[in-house]
């Protein structure tokens, strides 16, 4: 995974409440045998018209928000089924962080496991951020994971993050990579443990 320390990029507001995983990644894009091309499916019914042409009214299709790496979202984002494809698609589309007041539990875990940071802030703070990024002149913000703050034209907002998830994101490690990073410690423990308890080794 890519490391996440300090990222400065465009942010797009998508403030609808209860955006579920079927909206994020419609079911017809779950049929592949690998993860390739899932970015095409992200918000498909919002991004494209029935004839397949881009919907010019959709925020991510508008020139001022194209290439956004952050989404400022409404409450309970990612509710619905637990399809991990939704997060894979967001990551392929270039989304590095989601900023909102609440996220569905399994979706939140899937995000952090796949290198997408979820940031929870208060109702007042999300309104402030959404207002800021709704203006093309101020829609570039910074997310400082090490300092745990969102930096906008109108000030900075602190956020909490699980220490373990933070370390994994900063180092760009998934669960397997994080475990392998402690290989020497694991082997040292194993050696000393079986030396002290030889009857346990088969």
Swiss-Prot record:
It catalyses: (2R,3S)-3-isopropylmalate = (2S)-2-isopropylmalate. GO terms for molecular function: 3-isopropylmalate dehydratase activity. It is an enzyme of class 4 (lyase). Belongs to the LeuD family. LeuD type 1 subfamily. Heterodimer of LeuC and LeuD. Keywords: Amino-acid biosynthesis, Branched-chain amino acid biosynthesis, Leucine biosynthesis, Lyase. One of its GO terms (cellular component) is 3-isopropylmalate dehydratase complex. Its EC number is 4.2.1.33. It comes from Mannheimia succiniciproducens (strain KCTC 0769BP / MBEL55E). It holds the Pfam family Aconitase_C. SUPFAM superfamilies: LeuD/IlvD-like. One of its GO terms (biological process) is L-leucine biosynthetic process. This is 3-isopropylmalate dehydratase small subunit 1. InterPro entries: 3-IsopropMal_deHydase_ssu, Aconitase/3IPM_dehydase_swvl, AconitaseA/IPMdHydase_ssu_swvl, IPMI_Swivel, LeuD. CDD domains: IPMI_Swivel. Pathway: Amino-acid biosynthesis; L-leucine biosynthesis; L-leucine from 3-methyl-2-oxobutanoate: step 2/4. Catalyzes the isomerization between 2-isopropylmalate and 3-isopropylmalate, via the formation of 2-isopropylmaleate. PANTHER family: 3-ISOPROPYLMALATE DEHYDRATASE SMALL SUBUNIT, 3-ISOPROPYLMALATE DEHYDRATASE SMALL SUBUNIT 2-RELATED-RELATED.
